[in-house]
Every structure is written in structure tokens, then in C-alpha cells.
């Protein structure tokens, strides 16, 4: 029997005794109480078989039944409480039920055991009513309760009967519907495991690309091979072309020196910021000395003064000559460095290469390093020319 929405069957202990137990035991017509509570031999059935036989469910996870008394022996009041899977055992002392300071009944608590030491979550609150004639009290009211969750109740029961079986079947019937709906819908969820390979491959590919890029940047063999393929005569021709262009720019500045307007006074000395390795340190000395002894910065000393001091350029042609001879000194420094490098190739190096067994490889390495040094020195020289040109134009 289903109760209307908003109504709950939750009588008190006093109402159970007065309004249900007494009429069930004394009245001839018990239909008014039987319509709500069914009569079942509770202590002969396993607890998971009882929910399906209840006519109404209480507010809690509980079910009410009338149980006829069944004495275990001919004498005494000991009841039959053994089932197929276990037994019901009384725990604690009975709790008296009072009305107007008079005891009208008592409540006993029974626990269901599947063995002597295995206690389950099934509990019975058994109500006994008192009257003047105790021979008339042939029924008790049992409130069967389950203290565990619905999942535990369904797993503890060997058969899927009762309310737990109905609810379990409802859940099982809903699962295929949800699966079918999810498969037919456009919002079907993808399995995240299928993207695991992609997420793992991306960092690996990035690491490989970074490693190859670093190797390519650190590898100077390609540049050295290109530099070795260019003969020294072409380097000298290229330097001469730069000298001609520089002489033209210097002469143009000399002819138009009266139009020069320096925005700010320039001070300081140009420094060589490009670093080279330890193997080229000895080759760097001639170039550095030649530049320091030349008039690279002194030739442009006129840019550090005002317009009235530029007239000194006409009186001192030595500055112009020094400017013109700048590139010639750098070219001479290159030739000197080449001669110095050739002289440093002594028999000791050849003997050492022979002992290692890599004489040819050692010569190629020295040649590549020498060409790389020339290339870096030319780059620094071009940077200085561009810097001087920008200063002269301003």
C-alpha cells in the first residue's frame, strides 16, 4: 500500500501498543489494522525476504509486521527465532512503554546472526502489549530495520527479492538506457586513454627537436668547410674592395667636413666584445696590437669636438692619411696573422699527430680553426667600419 504524498507512517511506541497491538489481539474485526500491517512469521524468515511482504514502508528503512507468537517448547514463553540462514537473538533488557505512568507494554531488540560470531546489520524492534488477560495477547508487532546501506542490503541477501530486488532491478534497467542514449547522442564522451599516446609523443618530439637544434648550432664543421673552400686570395680581394669603399667614404667626409654637426660629444674607446676560444688566443695578439697602434679612434677624434675645432683637419693632413691607411693596416694584420700561424706549425705538432695516428685529421682541424678565426676577425672589422661610417654620417 502506498501512502499519499506528504504522509508518513511513523507511529510512536505508545501508539503502536494502543492503536495496533490491542485491537489486533482483542477485536474480532481487525481489518482496520490489517490494511496497513501484514501478518508474517517474521522469526522464521531471513530478514532480506521480509521487505517484499510489507504493505507500507516507514519513514526510515524499516517495515512493520504482525507476528504470531510461536513457543519453542510446550511450557514457557521462549519463542522460535531460527531461520534458514541464521537466527535472531535478543540483546539487552526490554524497554518499558509507559502511558499515564503505567506500563502498557515493552520493546525488545533482536539482532540477526548468520553464525555465533557473525552479526549482521538487520535489527528487529519487537513490541509486546500488556493487558489484564495475558492469554489474549497472541500477536506482537515487529519493526524490521536495516542499519546498512541499500547496496549492502542487496549484497547480503542471497536472493534478489523484496524492495531491494525491485530497486536493484530498476537500477539495472536504467543502466542500459543510459548507455544506449549516450551511444546515440552526439555528445558521446571520448575515451581519454586514446589521447595518452599523443600527449606522450608531443614532449618526446619537442625534446628531440631541441636536441637536434643545439647540435646544429654547436656544429662548426659546415662553416669550416665553407671557409676552407674559399682561398686566401679571394679573402684579400674582398678586403681590398672594402678598403676602396672605405677610402671613398673617408674622402667624402674630408671634402664635406664643414657640413658636419655632431649632436653630442663622443668619448671612450672601441672595445672588442666578440670572444674567441683558447686555441685562437695566440692568433688574436697581432691583430689587437695592430689596431691599438693604429689611429682607429684617433682618426675620428674630430667627431669629439665642436665645429670650430674641425678646422684643425685642414691644418693637419696627417689625420686624413691615418684614416686612409686604416684598412691597409688591418689587411697587413691579416697577412701577419697568416704568416704567424704558418710559422707556428712546427715538427713537434706533426710528431704528436703521428703518435696519435690522426696527423691528417689534426691538420684539417687546425686549418678549419684558422679559417674560422679569419672569418670572425673579418666580421669584427666590418662591424667597426659600419660603426665608424654611422658616426661620420651623423
Curated annotation (Swiss-Prot):
The residues covered by the NAC domain are 3-147
Query: According to the UniProt entry, which residue ranges have a biased composition of type Polar residues?
Result: 286-300
Gene Ontology annotations for the cellular component aspect, listed alphabetically: nucleus; plasma membrane
Keywords in alphabetical order, please.
DNA-binding, Nucleus, Transcription, Transcription regulation
Q: Which InterPro entries match?
A: NAC-dom (IPR003441), NAC_dom_sf (IPR036093)
Q: Where is this region: Disordered?
A: 152-173, 264-300
**Where does the protein end up?**
Nucleus
Write down the DNA-binding region ranges. 104-153
Q: Is Transcription set as a keyword in this record?
A: yes
Q: Which GO terms describe its molecular function?
A: DNA-binding transcription factor activity; transcription cis-regulatory region binding
- Which Gene3D superfamilies does the record cross-reference, listed alphabetically? NAC domain
Chief location bin = nucleus
Point out the coiled-coil segments of this chain: none
An example Pfam family from this entry, by short name, is NAM
Biased composition range(s): Low complexity: 155-165
Q: Which PANTHER family match?
A: NAC DOMAIN-CONTAINING PROTEIN 82-RELATED
Q: Can you quote the domain comment?
A: The NAC domain includes a DNA-binding domain and a dimerization domain.
By what name is this protein known? Answer: NAC domain-containing protein 3
Amino acid at each position: 500500500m502506498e501512502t499519499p504524498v506528504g504522509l508518513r507512517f511513523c507511529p510512536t511506541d505508545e501508539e503502536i501498543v494502543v492503536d495496533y497491538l490491542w485491537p489486533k489481539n482483542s477485536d474480532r474485526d481487525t481489518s482496520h489494522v490489517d490494511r496497513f500491517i501484514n501478518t508474517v512469521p517474521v522469526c522464521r524468515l531471513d530478514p532480506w525476504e521480509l521487505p517484499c511482504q510489507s504493505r507500507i514502508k516507514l519513514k526510515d528503512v524499516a517495515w512493520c509486521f504482525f507476528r504470531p507468537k510461536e513457543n519453542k517448547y510446550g511450557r514457557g514463553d521462549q519463542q522460535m527465532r531460527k531461520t534458514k540462514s541464521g537466527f535472531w537473538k535478543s540483546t539487552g533488557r526490554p524497554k518499558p512503554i509507559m502511558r499515564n505512568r503505567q506500563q502498557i507494554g515493552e520493546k525488545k531488540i533482536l539482532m540477526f546472526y548468520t553464525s555465533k560470531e557473525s552479526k549482521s546489520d538487520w535489527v528487529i524492534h519487537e513490541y509486546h502489549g500488556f493487558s489484564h488477560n495475558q492469554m489474549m495477547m497472541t500477536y506482537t508487532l515487529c519493526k524490521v530495520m536495516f542499519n546498512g546501506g541499500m547496496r549492502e542490503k542487496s549484497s547480503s541477501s542471497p536472493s534478489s527479492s523484496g524492495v531491494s530486488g525491485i530497486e536493484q532491478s530498476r537500477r539495472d534497467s536504467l543502466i542500459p538506457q543510459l548507455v544506449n542514449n549516450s551511444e546515440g547522442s552526439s555528445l558521446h564522451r571520448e575515451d581519454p586513454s586514446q589521447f595518452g599516446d599523443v600527449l606522450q609523443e608531443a614532449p618526446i618530439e619537442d625534446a628531440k627537436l631541441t636536441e637536434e637544434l643545439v647540435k646544429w648550432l654547436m656544429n662548426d664543421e659546415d662553416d669550416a668547410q665553407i671557409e676552407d673552400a674559399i682561398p686566401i686570395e679571394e679573402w684579400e680581394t674582398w678586403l681590398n674592395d672594402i678598403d676602396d669603399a672605405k677610402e671613398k667614404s673617408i674622402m667624402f667626409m674630408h671634402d664635406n667636413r664643414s657640413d658636419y654637426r655632431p649632436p653630442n660629444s663622443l668619448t671612450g674607446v672601441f672595445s672588442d666584445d666578440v670572444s674567441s676560444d683558447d686555441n685562437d688566443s695566440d692568433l688574436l695578439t697581432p691583430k689587437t696590437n695592430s689596431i691599438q697602434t693604429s689611429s682607429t679612434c684617433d682618426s675620428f677624434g674630430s667627431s669629439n669636438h665642436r665645429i670650430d675645432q674641425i678646422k684643425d683637419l685642414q691644418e693637419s693632413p696627417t689625420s686624413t692619411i691615418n684614416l686612409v691607411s686604416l684598412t691597409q693596416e688591418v689587411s697587413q694584420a691579416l697577412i701577419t696573422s697568416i704568416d704567424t700561424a704558418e710559422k707556428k706549425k712546427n715538427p713537434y705538432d706533426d710528431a704528436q699527430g703521428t703518435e696519435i695516428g690522426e696527423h691528417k685529421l689534426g691538420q684539417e682541424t687546425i686549418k678549419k680553426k684558422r679559417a674560422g678565426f679569419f672569418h670572425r676577425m673579418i666580421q669584427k672589422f666590418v662591424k667597426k667600419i659600419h660603426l665608424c661610417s654611422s658616426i661620420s654620417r651623423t
